[in-house]
Amino acid sequence: MSSLTNNTFMEEEPRGVTVIATKVAENSKNPRRYSLVHQASCETQHHKGIRRQNTIQHRKQLTDQMRCQKILQQLNDEGIEVIFTANDVTPIEFSIILTSTDPTLSNFVSDILQNMSSAKVQICHVETRGNEASHDVLLACKATKNQLIHSAELLTQNHVALTKFSIFAKKLSDEKNQSQIWFPRHISELDQCSKCITKYEPTTDPRHPGHGDVAYIARRKFLNDQALEFKFGDEIGYVDYTEEEHATWKAVYEKLGDLHLSHTCAVYRQNLKILQEEKVLTADRIPQIRDVNKFLQKKTGFELRPCSGLLSARDFLASLAFRVFQTTTYLRHHKSPHHSPEPDLIHELLGHVPMFSDPLLAQMSQDIGLMSLGASDEHIEKLSTVYWFIVEFGLCKEDGKLKAIGAGLLSAYGELMHACSDAPEHKDFDPAVTAVQKYEDDDYQPLYFVADSIHDALAKLRKYASSMDRPFSVVYDPFTKSIEAIESSADLEKAFSRLSNDLSAITHAADRMKISITM
């Protein structure tokens, strides 16, 4: 489970979680687990709230600039923003929808053209639609701020039957909007994506298992402070875990052991066995992150990066694009080893690491990360939901039985048994459907998505990616650990050049194999 998803891993009974530190969380219903889905939804609503507050303020400011107050009463919120952000020098392109109860459409159109012309607004396109009660006219226009305001004032004053005046910014497939959304282009820029924005702390919530434990709180703060200091290029420090922490790790490790044999997918079992054989994961001692990274780098190129808690959904997903997983370093409280109200190191190591050792699951996680770069808030929320339901709580079919592939299940004894039972509903994994699935969290989840295999899930995810409306594509360069945005033919040529070199080597190897076979 990522430090981003701040999940409550339930082993016995449901427990509430109060999330502190952000106004969004304070105003939200306290969830049983503070999930990636919940976080992304909160961020979307938070941004919408900010935009709404700005619009209200801008509407007040425009009151002093516009003589006819009737316009402001009729004008939509987007229209307010179009006018507010325009200037008197550079013309902008926009659309207007006008509605009139004038029984004669020709009179309405005539008034529009006359008043727009008087205000020197350039009309590029006109469409009309009418019925018995009213007429609608859509116009594509070009004008400066003063010209736009003047045309609105004239039309409102001269056409008394006008009932609707809506302005919309020109949409260029959201290209300009999305191109302005910052995202990291090099792995070093993940330093800007590692700020913890929400914390579920034992210092603030009495329902946290560690609440009131001064030693645990101090230990947790020490580990979080270390994580905050980590920067790209730093060697991940050695953590001297206490005997109490090792005992907590062992208790969870051994309790999940038998269940892992019967309830988890073959990929997980195979990689867990290798991790155990190579002594990366053992029951007695908590592994060091840097040792785990050496293993992952050889297997799939993934690596763990220390962070202090909950990141934004956008930042967490962006990290996956570089095959970086932001991980907490603290452990759950020793008095509640089989229940964690948030992601902790035990979840990261027992849930995610064996799955990140699989090339297909690693690729699927990176694909979700790449899809998130430059995406809108709405798409971030959808991608977070897909990630949650497949990478964290996904199931697959093996030999006619349900097996866990999601890290949230693989590290949670109680929910793992529940998910694979007949109690919840199970649906075939379809990213388009999963992306809009409402997340329920009053108790164990009532619904889980099931993939035929990890390969099947990856194929469906890539098909879903092709349907996303984004004005550019991105390619990850593993040599420089950087992201290339493909926006022009020149960018495409560069990407093809690298692909051509790889294909040449593969073709050469294939030719040699043919020669060997014929001999």
Swiss-Prot record:
Phenotypic consequence of gene deletion: Reduced (30-40% of wild type) level of dopamine thought to be due to defects in dopamine synthesis. Defects in serotonin signaling. Affects mechanosensory behavior including foraging and exploration activity. Hypersensitivity to odorants. Blocks the enhanced slowing response phenotype caused by bilobalide, a neuroprotective plant chemical. No significant effect on lifespan. Shows rapid reduction in reversal rate during tap habituation that is rescued by exogenous dopamine.
Activity control: Inhibited by dopamine with an IC(50) of 32.6 uM for the unphosphorylated form and 43.4 uM for the phosphorylated form. Phosphorylation leads to an increase in the catalytic activity.
Keyword check for Phosphoprotein: yes
Entry keyword Cytoplasm: yes
Modified residues (Phosphoserine): S35
Cofactor(s), by name: Fe(2+)
One Pfam family, short name: Biopterin_H
Pathway per the UniProt entry: Catecholamine biosynthesis; dopamine biosynthesis; dopamine from L-tyrosine: step 1/2
Tissue: Expressed in dopaminergic cells. Expressed in neurons in the head and middle body of the hermaphrodite, and six neurons in the tail of the male. Expressed in ADE and CEP neurons.
Catalytic activity: (6R)-L-erythro-5,6,7,8-tetrahydrobiopterin + L-tyrosine + O2 = (4aS,6R)-4a-hydroxy-L-erythro-5,6,7,8-tetrahydrobiopterin + L-dopa
Subcellular location: Cytoplasm, Perinuclear region; Cell projection, Axon
InterPro entries: ArAA_hydroxylase, ArAA_hydroxylase_Fe/CU_BS, ArAA_hydroxylase_sf, Aro-AA_hydroxylase_C_sf, Aromatic-AA_hydroxylase_C, Eu_TyrOH_cat, Tyrosine_3-monooxygenase-like
Gene3D superfamilies: Aromatic amino acid hydroxylase
Gene Ontology process terms (BP): cellular response to amphetamine; dopamine biosynthetic process; dopamine biosynthetic process from tyrosine; habituation; mechanosensory behavior; negative regulation of locomotion involved in locomotory behavior; positive regulation of male mating behavior; regulation of locomotion
EC number: 1.14.16.2
Family assignment from sequence similarity: Belongs to the biopterin-dependent aromatic amino acid hydroxylase family.
Other remarks on this protein: Plays a role in promoting amphetamine-induced loss of motility in water, termed swimming-induced paralysis.
Function noted in UniProt: Involved in the synthesis of catecholamines, such as dopamine. Has a role in serotonin signaling. Required for normal explorative and foraging behavior. In response to food, involved in promoting the dopamine-mediated suppression of crh-1/CREB1 transcription factor activation in cholinergic SIA neurons. Modulates male mating behavior by controlling the protrusion of copulatory spicules from the tail of males during hermaphrodite vulval location. Plays a role in modulating tap habituation in animals.
Name the UniProt record assigns to this protein: Tyrosine 3-monooxygenase
Lineage, highest ranks first: Eukaryota, Metazoa, Ecdysozoa, Nematoda, Chromadorea
Primary gene name: cat-2
